[in-house]
């Protein structure tokens, strides 16, 4: 399956159902009156973390996700049915961004609210009072939340395998786990992160084979920053370095890899790390190993020839890797953010655009919410709309801008002549 770790989508939660204007008129019923029911809630959109997924490919073709609308209210005070919620599976490690701000980090196999459905509108039964026993007032359902989101996947792995291209990372992953990565004798065989579950005794951990890094990866060279971000999720790092092949310099390779990690995120160097010195069966190995130990005496090194490793060697490697995940190692810092707490501050409740031909266009989130919520289907609703608009100062502002009788005013889809 194609690996996709970044997509942009639009989510539109369901609209709430409209409340209705209705009166009870039945023979032999002496207590009639308003009985218009409320609209149902619009359906919300949830993302659900799924450990069985490892790509955002399903979103690559589905750019828009729509929630189900709530049903309108009915007579006899009946509330409309709620719109069905939508639950969409996403890979663990998916981050959700709104206008470049992280709003949700999906790290657990549970549901996360992404877009909330709109509240259902009230029917005229709710507007009865001692002064108005037969109100012709109702509300439309609110629109569901509508967001343009960027989804970014950072694989959830305990240990990341890093190294230069063709160093043996894929071979190692195939030996210690059930993963079957592509293995070949040329550079950049691995073009996307490969995950494998490593079992050791009664425990297990997840290892990620990350595409080979070259000098300048942090600034975009090679696979570059596209895959460096996946290392941020790891709790430990294993360097796989070729110590035996001709024209290889393990010291230079190790320094370059650490430099790229540091440039990308300095915190990566705080993670527990070991080096697997690969190709110990080749002539240059001992010479390179001795030089490396002199340069980095504190670095833990495991000698191996991965291509011909015996089972006991593989078990030792697994034990050493598992040891990196001890209690003293740094814990991954993860922040879960509740999207329902996001608020948008309006600079102004409305914006007026005027033209020389006596045309005024009104826009703005607050005025849009008012015009959307109050249906102009009765005299009482029109009066209610007029009172709310007057309260926010729209009429006064139009007068200041020189509006004249007969001028046309448009508020989204609603138009009227000024009188």
From Swiss-Prot:
CDD domains: Obg (cd01898). GO terms for biological process: ribosome biogenesis. Signal peptide: none annotated. GTP binds at residues 163-170, 188-192, 209-212, 278-281, 315-317. Disulfide bonds: none annotated. It comes from the Bacteria. Its EC number is 3.6.5.-. GO terms for molecular function: GTP binding; GTPase activity; magnesium ion binding. This is GTPase Obg. It comes from Mesomycoplasma hyopneumoniae (strain J / ATCC 25934 / NCTC 10110).
